[in-house]
Amino acid sequence: MDLCQVFLTLALAVTSSTFSGSEATPATLGKASPVLQRINPSLGTSSSGKPRFTKCRSPELETFSCYWTEGDNPDLKTPGSIQLYYAKRESQRQAARIAHEWTQEWKECPDYVSAGKNSCYFNSSYTSIWIPYCIKLTTNGDLLDQKCFTVDEIVQPDPPIGLNWTLLNISLTGIRGDIQVSWQPPPNADVLKGWIILEYEIQYKEVNESKWKVMGPIWLTYCPVYSLRMDKEHEVRVRSRQRSFEKYSEFSEVLRVIFPQTNILEACEEDIQFPWFLIIIFGIFGVAVMLFVVIFSKQQRIKMLILPPVPVPKIKGIDPDLLKEGKLEEVNTILGIHDNYKPDFYNDDSWVEFIELDIDEADVDEKTEGSDTDRLLSNDHEKSAGILGAKDDDSGRTSCYDPDILDTDFHTSDMCDGTLKFRQSQKLNMEADLLCLDQKNLKNLPYDASLGSLHPSITQTVEENKPQPLLSSETEATHQLASTPMSNPTSLANIDFYAQVSDITPAGGDVLSPGQKIKAGIAQGNTQREVATPCQENYSMNSAYFCESDAKKCIAVARRMEATSCIKPSFNQEDIYITTESLTTTAQMSETADIAPDAEMSVPDYTTVHTVQSPRGLILNATALPLPDKKNFPSSCGYVSTDQLNKIMQ
């Protein structure tokens, strides 16, 4: 099949030589060329030894030029031996139809000189944009090569011109620098009016390198190049192309960039690059390993820091198992033993300030005989107005020096000074007679007659002078003093100030059980008056403290009585202070030794516990007296402790 086509082509070529005239040859070639291209595209051009088109380009989209080669035939190297014919078509459809009909007229190249050797130049008058062109090469009527295109497809601008560079910056080490390369667009491209739009590509490298570094495409006519070695020479070149096309122009002239000379040592230091990346990697790995080791070794402590344990309830001296098992009795026992856990009952229980009883005179002896009421309340308290229980800011007890009552109308007897002096003088006068009485005479004589006849001043002193409250600067609780006239003075030695606890109040106080009655020793009449001993004159029975002067007098009396009774007083070392009752008992032991206990006397009834002195001892709250109408100011006196009193008694 292919051989038949070749023979047909040769036959047509031979027959074409029989026609004469110059116009017949192009027409025949025009008819034969499309047929050859349709039959075999490889036959569109002659063999490699024949002339052919190399390129067609339009630098500014206004003109274009086409170039070809001479071939191997020496006859074709002579000028004018090869001709270029072109043909314009109105449109692609019309061009295809005309080419198919073989009726289009071909025109020869208008200029073989302007574009150079073996070229054809088409100026603006022969150039039409967006209109297809077809060109062909012939020699002596023979078709050498053929090509069709449009002008906008063959645009290939000229290279940029006027390359230059400017130093922008130098690094702190002085080893690298930044430059800016600038250029001008091709002079024949109408870039300013926008007829053609160009984009550029810049390439640079060191002189001794073979590979170029590419930057682009760039629309501007300048471009910065960063981090160039200042100790090396660099080459820069630029080329351009129409936007959205693939064909670049030729490269511009190479621009050499030479920096000023720099220190060679600095360049060497720059060449030695420190492996910062590896150091960072190994550093992070080492820190992670250290953290893992620390967390693994201290995991218990870290766990306690993050999640601290819940503290177990714990009381010092108490087993927590007792609280868990609910053994509250044992816990209360432990709390009672330790002083730190003792409750302050005085904060919860209010003290009794005074007790008022409405008792008929006829029933006084019957109801109050042998009871605590005889000691707490008496007719002398109601009649007397010289007893004052004033609270001192420092000690909590009564004081004659309270500034709030300095302007009070004093009693006419001047209880703080006159009464005390009068009593002291009476005691000095009666002391010798009272202590020198014969024990036998005291036993034989009636009590009222002996004391009333021998010492009438004693009864008068007791009736007129009420017991004064004693001062204390070291006690915490405020105690009001009370006078306790009793039918028999010997019963004072047998009164108990401690009793058994029978119940506990909700506020924390203890209720004592009533005590059993005891023998008093001497029958008491309903109309008998109480006769005070020398040691009872200057202090009250209910007072928890005593004055130093009164103590010395009582001790002197007790020593005189030791000669007859041979009874030596003793004081408990556990007590912090000596109570008035103990002194009274010691002073009266000689008088009560020979008296037979015939009468019965009851111990104190009910009261509240002030504090726990020992596991088996309770200190009771004293009963306060009602405040009188007028204030009396007792004189101040010192206090004697247990050790001091024992030394004096020895």
Curated annotation (Swiss-Prot):
A motif (WSXWS motif) lies at residues 248-252. GO terms for molecular function: growth hormone receptor activity; peptide hormone binding. InterPro entries: FN3_dom (IPR003961), FN3_sf (IPR036116), GHBP (IPR025871), Growth/epo_recpt_lig-bind (IPR015152), Ig-like_fold (IPR013783), Long_hematopoietin_rcpt_CS (IPR003528). Expressed in all tissues tested including, liver, heart, adipose tissue, mammary gland, testes, ovary, brain, kidney and muscle. Highest levels in liver. A motif (Box 1 motif) lies at residues 306-314. Glycans are attached at N123, N164, N169, N208. Keywords: Cell membrane, Disulfide bond, Endocytosis, Glycoprotein, Membrane, Phosphoprotein, Receptor, Secreted, Signal, Transmembrane, Transmembrane helix, Ubl conjugation. It is found in: Cell membrane. One of its GO terms (biological process) is endocytosis. Pfam families: EpoR_lig-bind (PF09067), GHBP (PF12772). GO terms for cellular component: extracellular region; extracellular space; membrane; nucleus; plasma membrane. It is a single-pass type I membrane protein. The WSXWS motif appears to be necessary for proper protein folding and thereby efficient intracellular transport and cell-surface receptor binding. The box 1 motif is required for JAK interaction and/or activation. This is Growth hormone receptor. It comes from Mus musculus.
